[in-house]
Design a protein with these regions (language model features):
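Flexible loop residues that form catalytic
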Residues: 28, 125, 165
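C-terminal helical cap(s) of enzyme catalytic domains, especially alpha/beta-barrels
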Residues: 169-188
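Acidic/histidine-rich catalytic cores of soluble enzymes
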Residues: 50-142
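Active-site acidic/histidine proton-transfer and metal-coordination neighborhood
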Residues: 1-87, 97, 172
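H/E-rich (His + Asp/Glu) clusters that bind or coordinate divalent metals
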Residues: 138-149, 155-163
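Non-catalytic positions within long, well-ordered alpha-helices that form the structural scaffold/packing
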Residues: 16, 110-113, 153
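A short, acidic, flexible beta-alpha connecting loop/helix-capping segment that sits on the rim
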Residues: 161-171
Length: 188
């Protein structure tokens, strides 16, 4: 949470113990644009303080950041108002779940400047015959992986994080399938 990140000394100590130089906040919720603007300001302030201690702070999206509030979407507020100290960790499944194009958003974030998208969460979305959305192994769903991976390469993404929140398969089998599919697509 932002409150936990705001405990600067404790946060830095914890991450230094783990020799971890990156952390990401997994979401903020509000249906008011003013709250999102205030969050962007506060989040940037905390990220700046943590960056001074060697910790890079990012924002990990879900689908609600693409909801239209008043006159803007939270993702637009964040990308326009968070300072360069904040990186973005795009989650491909949740971008698609929101009806947006993951490769386009990777390009939007990359255009903000160097270092703004060091990692991407790779998850696929599958549409069932019953028109239900569900997570699937990378390459087994409906996402345009050639475009996503090209955008990641163009953005100089350093870490490709395969993630599976829920599924029918054993998590390790799911990971194996995703990795095999990514390798078949040329990602090493």
């Amino acid at each position: 949470s932002l409150e936990e990140l705001n405990d600067i000394d404790k946060c830095l100590s914890y991450h230094q113990t783990l020799d971890c130089h990156y952390t990401a906040l997994g979401g903020f919720h509000s249906d008011r644009t003013e709250d999102w603007s205030q969050f962007a300001k506060d989040f940037t302030d905390v990220a700046r303080k943590l960056a001074d201690g060697g910790l890079h702070v990012g924002y990990h999206n879900h689908s609600h950041e693409w909801a239209l509030l008043d006159t803007s979407r939270p993702i637009n507020i964040l990308t326009e108002q968070c300072g360069p100290e904040v990186y973005f960790e795009i989650d491909t499944y949740w971008v698609a779940h929101a009806g947006a194009d993951p490769s386009a958003w990777i390009n939007v974030i990359a255009a903000l400047g160097p270092g703004r998208i060091p990692s991407v969460h790779l998850k696929d979305i599958q549409i069932s015959a019953e028109r239900q959305q569900k997570m699937s192994e990378v390459g087994a769903g409906n996402l345009n992986w050639p475009a996503i991976l090209a955008a990641c390469r163009n953005a100089s993404v350093q870490w490709y994080l395969v993630e599976r929140d829920a599924g029918d398969l054993d998590p390790f089998e799911s990971l194996k399938i995703s990795l095999e599919n990514l390798r078949a697509m040329g990602l090493e």
